[in-house]
Amino acid sequence: MQWKGAAMARIATFDDWIDYFRQWQKDIGYDPALLGDYNFETKLGELHTGEIEFGDFKGQSKWERIGQIPNQSIRDALMNLIVYQGDTEFASVEQQKNLLDKAPTEYDRQALIRVNSEEMRHGWQMCYLLVNYFGDSGKLEAKKLLERRAFRGDRLLGSFNAPVNNWLDFFTYTEFVDRDGKYQLTMLSHSSFAPLAQSVTAMLKEEFFHMFTGHTGLTRILKAGKIPVPIVQKYFNKWLSTAYDLFGTDHSSSAHWAYVWGLKGRFDEHEAQLPAAKDKLNDLARDHYIAECGKLIDQLNALVPPGEPKLYAPDLKFNRSIGEHVGKRYSVTGELLSEDDYDKHVRDVLPTAEDEKLLNEITKGKDWVAQAQVS
């Protein structure tokens, strides 16, 4: 279901899209006044190199225009990458906007506003590419990016339809889901399509604040010691299991061809010495991510009091919505369970209505999160 007038809207220029963006803000209930003098603009960073870095076209000049791309299959795959990235950005704002009036401190409220403004700008950047480079089909996709809704459950990726109901949700989301974003943007920063590579290089610089917000937020929660560690663990189980899905299916053919065509590289493309294992690109990126998250969790565990259970990342097979483990009844520690045992296990290890009720009680005060260290 679209908002009033949406069906009549037509995107002919980027200015038309900007008008539609303003309507989107209004429709989701996001007051632009909250953003102050934030300037929505397109930003282009530096290319790693002017030459295509990998794949069948390695060594050729990066493509500056769609007409330079050799065939329609490559153009379609490129547009699809941009659409999916843009969809995550607008979805994040829709998921998080309800927390503005629940911020524990003014510092946190301003941090959330900054995160939201940068997510909007990243979506803006992707739509700039769609409208200005991809003709009528790109304009249609840019329009659709503002018509899907996280709270209707029709965003393109499952993580971006999940509810973000409280600030523990938010801090865990920005720690782990935004960290996936770092990986996706890094892989796209090597793209053979120069305008995309330049766009995501600029976006990456802003993404680091989102991850910083998540990690320091979780640090402050553990320092305060008011929210039980087992409840924090449940939110890790919720968001990490869905973040694993964001890397795509195992043995992905689309990732294979994106690499062959130079559209999306490896996370460590700039330092990789060995030829790419093109059938395992998603798996290898996910492995890097899991290793990084493990180190972050180790840092957080230093704040867990003696006698309390240590935090951990759920097993890769738990609660998966895509890939070879989808629909299988694995526990958070990787054991295969019976149907009855699994149903009980899920109730024990993912956030429940009772957990949210307890969190709401705890977070009515201001002492559930330690004071932010502002330099």
Model regions: which residues?
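Amphipathic, well-ordered alpha-helical segments in soluble domains
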Residues: 88-96, 122, 177-184, 210-214
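Glycine-rich cofactor-pocket loops
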Residues: 193-194, 222-228
